[in-house]
Every structure is written in structure tokens, then in C-alpha cells.
Amino acid sequence: MKIRFYRSSDREALQAYQLTDLRFTNHPKEAVADLENRYAIVGLEEDQIVTFLILDAGEKKYTYGGQPDSLLLRNFSTDEDFQMRGYGSQTLKLLPDFIREHLPMYKSIILGVNERNQVASYLYRETGFSKQPQRI
């Protein structure tokens, strides 16, 4: 598995991305409509998009205690056809090194997690995130 920045050539693949439970996130095709101060990241397994997330460098991060060198992780999802295979965990584990390499001006990741989203909370804890900013 690998992660990389979203490309406009991914647009068609995002149309086919299966995500029906939208209680806690937007569909990726909606999330890429506004990328001002945001970085869209896709997780790939054999060139198939299996995960998606936004790293938001805008003002919203301050709502969660972010600093100028923080990124707010939002809109994180796994395509329903690929859930329960570890792709979400792998994506989160690859993310700190990806940021170090491609966005070195940022030093921490802020999570804005709805308390009712127990699956996300568990996933973040299991991949080393805590209630404090994740230092990278």
C-alpha cells in the first residue's frame, strides 16, 4: 500500500468510491470540490483508491487547538468495498512519514473526531494517536 496526493485524474475513481454512511464525513468527491488550504490524500492498493483523507491547513484547525504548524486530519474514510482489511490503519501509519517528506513545514496532526464515531476513535488510538496533537 502507498499514499500520495490526490490528482485530477483520480476524479473518475472517486465517483466509484463506495461510501454510504455519511454521518461523520463527506464523500471524497464532495471533499475535493474545495481544496483551498487543503491537501487531499489517497491511499492506494495496486493502483485502486482504497482510502481518502484531507489534511486541512486552514483556519478550522484552530477550533481543535491547532497551531500554525499543524494540519487538521478530516474526511478520512475507507471505501466500503475495502473495509476491515487494515487499509485505514496502514494509511494512518504511513501519514507521518508522508508529511515529513512532502509537507515538512507542518509538525503535528490534529484530529477532529466526533465522540459518537467510536470506530474512528478506536482506529486513531490503535495507530498511535492520542488526545494531544500527534507530533511528527
Regions found by a protein language model. Give the residues of each.
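Extreme N-terminal starter segment of soluble prokaryotic enzymes
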Residues: 1-2
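Acetyl-CoA-dependent GNAT
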Residues: 5-75, 79-81, 92, 98-102
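Active-site acidic-Proline motif in GNAT/NAT acetyltransferases
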Residues: 79-85, 115-116
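Residues forming the Rossmann-fold NAD(P)(H) cofactor-binding site
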Residues: 89
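Conserved beta-strand-loop-alpha-helix junction that forms the acyl-donor binding cleft
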Residues: 105-121
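Conserved catalytic-core motifs of GNAT/GCN5-like acyltransferases
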Residues: 110-112, 125-136
